């Protein structure tokens, strides 16, 4: 029988957490699933644990690869291997809430065939052992179904910083394959690139409001906590440069909803401004590193970036042009940094 769910689990250096993660799958009363374990070269016995589960239960399948630095490669291979109707992305240090697969199945069966089923994630603080928040981009009273562009516009209207986590959404396998929705190899934070593209192509988005995923936050040694933010700048630059190119491609279509330019521009450019130029980042990340990575971001000059500025606020438009000047004109770098110190100070005063 074809699995209903394909659960894709990237595994690298997660031996202390992997048994709990896989047990949370095995113990689900709902049993029609396969679990694809993407094991990258690890410094611990992650692979041994993964193969132990595969030896005991044929629903677990192990594939291996070299150490890549992120979940992207394992997720991409998992999508290619998946035989289930729907895909769930689960990290090897996180768990699935008890009994939630059956609830997900029942809710999906009531509205079958959607491309994306956004759910909710419970955030567990690794240091305190307490659930600190539940992330759900859609309020309980949201309408039951959107198109992808409608969902993008709706979320932008109610959330300044929606959660882009891939784990938040159950995806129809055929939809991901049809639109070649993959992660960029080796990059951290790939959710930020995947989510807007998936929403753009989705014809049906059905929020389920099911808090099925338990996300372990602040874990020592995780990719998020163990890498200096200056190192992550290169990944952020590649991700956003890819998004700029994506916007240029799809915005040329006659059917493109021009409101998406404003939404994407506001979101992406404000994130870039904060990531490269907030006072804390200016202090902690060397100027040379910020210049180097902005050159990646603006590798096509103003061609892909400029059109996004048209729909953003006046202050953000000025900030966007300042970022470009910082990357291209060495003599303006100190003045631009001074501008951003004032920019973020005024933003803080305005929001207080």
Say what each PLM segment does:
Residues 3-6, 34, 193:
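Cell-envelope/extracellular polymer assembly enzymes that use nucleotide-activated donors
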Residues 13-27:
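Short, well-formed alpha-helical segments that are part of the catalytic scaffolds
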Residues 31, 39-49, 67-68:
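A conserved acidic beta->alpha catalytic loop
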Residues 65-82:
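Glycine-rich, basic loop-to-helix element that forms the pyrophosphate-binding segment
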Residues 92-208, 213-231:
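Donor-binding/catalytic cores of nucleotide-activated saccharide
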Residues 278-352:
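Membrane-interface aromatic/basic loop that binds lipid-linked glycans or pyrophosphate carriers
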């Amino acid at each position: 029988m074809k699995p209903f769910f394909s659960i894709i689990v990237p595994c690298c250096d997660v031996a202390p957490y992997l048994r709990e993660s896989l047990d949370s799958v095995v113990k689900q009363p709902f049993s029609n699933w396969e679990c694809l374990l993407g094991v990258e070269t690890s410094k611990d016995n992650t692979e041994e644990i993964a193969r132990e589960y595969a030896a005991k239960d044929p629903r677990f399948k192990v594939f291996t690869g070299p150490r890549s630095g992120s979940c992207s490669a394992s997720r991409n291979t998992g999508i290619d291997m998946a035989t289930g109707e729907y895909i769930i992305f689960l990290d090897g240090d996180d768990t699935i809430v008890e009994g939630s697969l059956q609830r997900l199945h029942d809710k999906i069966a009531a509205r079958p065939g959607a491309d994306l089923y956004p759910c909710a994630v419970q955030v567990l603080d690794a240091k305190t052992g307490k659930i600190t928040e539940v992330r759900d981009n859609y309020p309980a009273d949201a309408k039951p179904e959107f198109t992808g562009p409608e969902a993008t516009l709706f979320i932008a209207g109610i959330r300044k910083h929606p959660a882009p986590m891939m784990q938040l959404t159950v995806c129809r396998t055929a939809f991901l394959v049809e639109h070649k929705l993959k992660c960029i190899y080796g990059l951290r934070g790939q959710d930020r690139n995947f989510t807007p593209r998936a929403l753009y192509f989705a014809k049906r988005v059905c929020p389920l409001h099911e808090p099925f995923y338990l996300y372990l936050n602040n874990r020592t040694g995780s990719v998020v906590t163990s890498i200096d933010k200056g190192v992550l700048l290169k990944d952020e630059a590649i991700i956003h440069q890819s998004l700029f190119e994506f916007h240029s491609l799809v915005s040329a279509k006659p059917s493109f909803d021009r409101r998406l330019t404003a939404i994407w521009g506001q979101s992406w450019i404000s994130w870039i401004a904060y990531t490269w130029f907030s006072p804390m980042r200016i202090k902690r990340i060397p100027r040379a590193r910020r210049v180097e990575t902005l050159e990646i971001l603006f590798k096509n000059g103003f061609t892909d970036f400029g059109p996004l500025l048209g729909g953003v606020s006046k202050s953000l438009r000025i900030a966007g042009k300042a970022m470009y000047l910082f990357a291209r004109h060495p003599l303006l770098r100190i003045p631009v940094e001074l501008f951003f110190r004032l920019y973020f100070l005024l933003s803080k005063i305005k929001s207080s």
